[in-house]
Design a protein with these regions (language model features):
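Acidic catalytic loop of the alpha/beta-hydrolase fold
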Residues: 235-239
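Conserved alpha/beta-hydrolase catalytic His-Asp/Glu region
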Residues: 138, 144, 161-223
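Short beta-strand/loop motif that positions the catalytic acidic residue
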Residues: 224, 230-232
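Flexible "cap/lid" loop of the alpha/beta hydrolase fold
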Residues: 114, 118, 125-163
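Gly/Ala-rich beta-loop-alpha elbow adjacent to hydrolase catalytic centers
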Residues: 105, 109, 113
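Catalytic active-site module of serine/aspartate enzymes centered on a nucleophile-bearing elbow/loop
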Residues: 254-289
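Conserved HGGG/HGGXW glycine-rich cap/lid loop of the alpha/beta-hydrolase fold
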Residues: 22-71
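Active-site loop/oxyanion-hole signature of alpha/beta-hydrolase fold enzymes
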Residues: 53, 63-104, 276
């Protein structure tokens, strides 16, 4: 399958409470939010360009750039970070006239969705979570780099001589894709060019300080009531398969699917497999209970 992202559809800006989001929309049907990861240069389109077009055949795909990413607001966050993101996402849903939705998420976006589902259960019909770290411990051993692998990678990418195309390529090959030979050059360039955004570089220069207070959601996950699929790459370089197994048992209605020959961005690396797994989850009989 061709993994090269096509040109993004025309997006729009939406004011949601105190924040302005930039979002893309495709398709009609049940509303599905796609929440992207937190790596340098990530946007909704960089993470979901190929697979979202499959979902758009039957769903209304809503693809916001998360706060501090892409073309959305990049103001400093104060207070608990996941509470801030979750509350702002609910504001966005309300502004769009959406009461409840499915959420398909990678990494950073998945932790936002879990916080949202725990605090606003009436707004979530289901969650699909890939590569997210809502809990600061592993079930069997400490997390890689004490759970700071992503933050360390960001600081290395922006440090030294600053962002380069080769540093972006190496970051994606080392941490996000299982088979580096499959990474489309167009995706590398898209991420690299976005990472040069002056506001993103200003945020990165301050490391964690403008992101808000980190939150461990372990005590909150028991409040996640909706069906939740943890769809994980067997070779995820951030969190090994025992971690989503732990998460699955922390939420009320968890399921786990492991996909081989996949790492942290399996929705990009194996979009057809990812689509069929997630779409079957959304269509399963008990999903509507």
């Amino acid at each position: 399958m061709d993994l090269t992202p096509k040109s993004a559809p025309e997006g729009r800006y939406v004011q949601a409470g105190d924040n302005t989001y930039y979002l893309l929309e495709m398709g009609d049907g049940r509303p599905v939010f796609f929440l992207h990861g937190g790596g340098p240069g990530c946007t909704s389109w960089s993470d979901f360009a190929v697979v979202s077009q499959m979902f758009a055949k039957t769903s209304r795909c809503i693809m916001p750039d998360l706060l501090q990413y892409g073309k959305s607001d990049k103001s400093e966050i104060t207070g608990p970070m996941w509470d801030h993101h979750a509350g702002s996402m609910v504001d966005l849903m309300s502004e769009l006239g959406i009461d409840r939705a499915d959420f398909i998420c990678n990494s950073w976006g998945g932790t936002i969705a879990l916080a949202l589902a725990a605090r606003y259960p009436e707004r979530t019909r289901s969650l699909t979570i890939t590569g997210s770290m809502p809990v600061f411990r592993g079930p069997l051993c400490p997390l890689p780099e004490a759970g700071r692998r992503g933050r360390n990678a960001r600081d290395i990418y922006y440090g030294g001589e600053g962002p380069t195309l080769e540093k972006m390529r190496q970051l994606m090959a080392r941490l996000e894709w299982y088979n580096a030979d499959l990474i489309p050059e167009e995706t590398v360039v898209m991420r690299y060019e976005q990472s040069l955004d002056p506001e993103e570089m200003a945020l990165a220069a301050r490391s964690d300080s403008p992101r808000g207070e980190w939150q461990d959601l372990e005590v909150d996950l028991k409040n996640v009531e909706c069906p939740t699929l943890f769809c994980w790459g067997l070779q995820d370089d951030f969190l090994t398969p025992d971690y989503p197994l732990m998460l699955m048992n922390m939420v009320q209605r968890g399921q786990l699917h492991l996909l081989d020959a996949s790492s942290h961005h399996l929705q990009e690396e194996r979009p057809e497999h990812y689509f069929h797994i997630v779409n079957s989850f959304l269509d399963q009989p008990d999903y509507k209970q």
